[in-house]
Amino acid sequence: MKCNECNRVQLKEGSVSLTL
């Protein structure tokens, strides 16, 4: 797994949380 991928997943999850 690439670090970039992990960061992208974390950012995506954070965005969803903020949106909700």
From Swiss-Prot:
One of its GO terms (biological process) is response to antibiotic. InterPro entries: Tet-R_leader_TetL. Keywords: Antibiotic resistance, Leader peptide, Plasmid. Pfam families: Tet_res_leader (PF08050). This is Tetracycline resistance leader peptide.
